[in-house]
């Protein structure tokens, strides 16, 4: 007969099997169900980067961000009713409304998030996409407690921990079980409990946790050496990658990502796209990259006119479906308006005529009343279209910039970034620089502008050439207390009339109150537009654009692409947006191994090359991680 211990083990296994068949209240990898909402919230906060161990000191910037988020939450009001079953893994909320500082962002709409679907949330800058994600992440909408949520909100704070440690520790249940198992390993009296712990750890694949964490970090660009550096030695962009790695490692039931590609290079973007394709629960993603949305999403949610509208398929399918629906809607609208005009005209002409005509007029009046009562088709309200503009720069004879035998390293004993570069660029140059992080793409732009000097060799520039460089930190140079109008008038005093400057700023999507509000009150996307307006009116011959799409919406990026294509001068671009590169670049230059080589195909061929590299690297990575 089976022993009592064997019976208990069998019972535990059955219970564990049942638990695996239903979603857990805590994180999927945290095991046992979380019964206290407060505990669940603490786990989510810890996962999002809050320091919970050590000396208890919180990075000052992190504290400021927390205070800022609290103020935003206090100014936010959300109402909605859960319409799906409380135990369902799908989330259906009706009568959803969202206001911020009294401004209505959503009104009486519905939120539908189904298990196994990956949603792209799209809409114009400032329409409230990030605000909606925050409301979901903070559970201000009625989402059942058994659905755990991970909302990636900020970078990891600087600390003594390594990226690998930070990713591993996010799985709090596994870490607790391993500590408990280690304690009980020497106590024979707790043999049964120890076996239960080992069984649970086996369910969590605890022995593979480090390998999985290392694989995720590698995909996001961390070499084995970088995975063991201290977090305080990384920039904010790299610490954001660590936070993203934690989100992917913990595998929550609902994952909310707001512009996850902003701090990634093309290699990491391709890896992340392939990784998210395998996400089997609920993913809600805000991204400005059409290519990324096409690769990841199974559904699109369009935030428009205070409503959430749902489309099946990726971004390209959404565009096609929306166009067809709007064409049909306008046909229906015009048909109804024609019918209404005809009936009103008939009623006016024959309402007081002969008995027969009067009866017909009354019949048409009843038909008209029924049409009005049942609701008429609305006219299609199109999104506002932007039209960016780079002023004519005039012609200067080639060569504009000559790079002759240039080598560069940041320090005398540091690694060589470039060695013996030799090339020229002119006003007809349209180049995208690609390559892994650290290969020197941004460094090259700084060398060409003169912000950095070559270690060896020479860079010759035409005496009259003007260069405009857009980079990720340009926003930091803005005077936040000034309005866009005041800032531009200060930067370009030769423009005396405010109305003339208003027209200039208006071409970059800043209108009305946005022009006269303090810059600090603008969204990140609107601040980027101020920077683009400032850059354009420097009247450069050469545009050097380093990640110009961060924080911009899809419509703004398309307007930027059109403006670049109409620009008379030369352009060099660093971007993780494959579609923008495809739109504006005539050549692809690969920065790698201390040199620059011209890619023989277009950017889409380069993307396929990166995908094939991922397939080739996977077995080597697994083998290397096993040997760690």
From Swiss-Prot:
Q: Where does ATP 2 bind?
A: 435-442
Q: Where does this protein have compositionally biased stretches of type Basic and acidic residues? A: 40-53
* Pfam families the record matches: ABC_tran, ABC_tran_Xtn
- Sites of the modification Phosphothreonine? 223
Q: Name one GO molecular function term.
A: ATP binding
Q: Sites of the modification Phosphoserine?
A: 517
N6-acetyllysine PTM positions read: 309
Any idea which positions bind ATP 1?
123-130
Q: Where is this region: Disordered?
A: 1-57
Q: Which family does it belong to?
A: Belongs to the ABC transporter superfamily. ABCF family. EF3 subfamily.
What name does the UniProt record give this protein? ATP-binding cassette sub-family F member 2
Annotated source species: Mus musculus (Mouse)
- What gene is it encoded by? Abcf2
């Amino acid at each position: 007969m089976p022993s009592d211990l064997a019976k208990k083990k069998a019972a535990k296994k059955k219970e564990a099997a049942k638990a695996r068949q239903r979603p857990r209240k805590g994180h999927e990898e945290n095991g046992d169900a979380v019964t206290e909402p407060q505990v669940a919230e603490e786990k989510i906060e810890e996962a999002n980067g809050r320091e919970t161990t050590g000396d208890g000191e919180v990075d000052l910037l992190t504290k400021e961000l927390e205070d800022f988020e609290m103020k935003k939450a206090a100014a936010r009001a959300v109402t909605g009713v859960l319409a799906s079953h409380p135990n369902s893994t799908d989330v259906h909320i009706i009568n959803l409304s969202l206001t911020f500082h009294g401004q209505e962002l959503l009104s009486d709409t519905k939120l539908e998030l189904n298990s196994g679907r990956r949603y792209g949330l799209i809409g114009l800058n400032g329409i409230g996409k990030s605000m909606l994600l925050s409301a979901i992440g903070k559970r201000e909408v009625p989402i059942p407690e058994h659905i755990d949520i991970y909302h990636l909100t900020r970078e990891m704070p600087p600390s003594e921990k390594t990226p690998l440690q930070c990713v591993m520790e996010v799985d709090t249940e596994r870490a607790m079980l391993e500590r408990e198992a280690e304690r009980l390993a020497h106590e024979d009296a707790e043999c049964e409990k120890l076996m239960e712990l080992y069984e649970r750890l086996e369910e969590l694949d605890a022995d593979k946790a480090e390998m999985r964490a290392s694989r995720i970090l590698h995909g996001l660009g961390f070499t084995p050496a970088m995975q063991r550096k201290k977090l305080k030695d990384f920039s904010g962009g790299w610490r954001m990658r660590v936070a993203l790695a934690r989100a992917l490692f913990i595998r929550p039931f609902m994952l909310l990502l707001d512009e996850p590609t902003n701090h990634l290079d093309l290699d990491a973007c391709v890896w992340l796209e392939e990784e998210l394709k395998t996400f089997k629960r609920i993913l809600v993603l805000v991204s400005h990259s059409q290519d990324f949305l096409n690769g990841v999403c199974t559904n699109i949610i369009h935030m428009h006119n205070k409503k959430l509208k749902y489309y099946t398929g990726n971004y390209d399918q959404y565009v096609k479906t929306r166009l067809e629906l709007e064409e049909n809607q306008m046909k229906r609208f015009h048909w109804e308006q024609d019918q209404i005009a005809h009936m009103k005209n008939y009623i006016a002409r024959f309402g007081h005529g002969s008995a027969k005509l009067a009866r017909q007029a009354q019949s048409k009046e009843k038909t008209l009343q029924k049409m009005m009562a049942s609701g008429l088709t609305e006219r299609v309200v199109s999104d506002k279209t932007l039209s960016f503009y780079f002023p004519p720069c005039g012609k200067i004879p080639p060569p504009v910039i000559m790079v002759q035998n240039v080598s560069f390293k940041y320090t005398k004993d540091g690694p060589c970034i470039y060695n013996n570069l030799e090339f020229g660029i002119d006003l007809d140059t349209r180049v995208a620089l690609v390559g892994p992080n650290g290969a020197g793409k941004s460094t090259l732009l700084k060398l060409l502008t003169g912000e950095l000097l070559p270690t060896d060799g020479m860079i010759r520039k035409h005496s009259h050439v003007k260069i405009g460089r857009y980079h990720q930190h340009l926003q930091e140079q803005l005077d936040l207390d000034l309005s866009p109008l005041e800032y531009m008038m200060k930067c370009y005093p030769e423009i005396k009339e405010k109305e003339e400057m208003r027209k200039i700023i208006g071409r970059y999507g800043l209108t009305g109150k946005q022009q006269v509000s303090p810059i600090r009150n603008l969204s990140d996307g609107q601040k980027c537009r101020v920077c683009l307006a400032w850059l354009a009116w420097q009247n450069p011959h050469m545009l050097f654009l380093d990640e110009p799409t961060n924080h911009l919406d899809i419509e703004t990026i398309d307007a930027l692409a059109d403006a670049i294509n109409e620009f008379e001068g030369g352009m060099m671009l660093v971007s993780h947006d494959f579609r923008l590169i495809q739109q504006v670049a005539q050549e692809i230059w690969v920065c790698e191994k201390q040199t620059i080589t011209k890619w023989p195909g277009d950017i889409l061929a380069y993307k396929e090359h990166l995908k094939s590299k991922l397939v080739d690297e996977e077995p080597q990575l697994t083998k290397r991680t096993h040997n760690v």
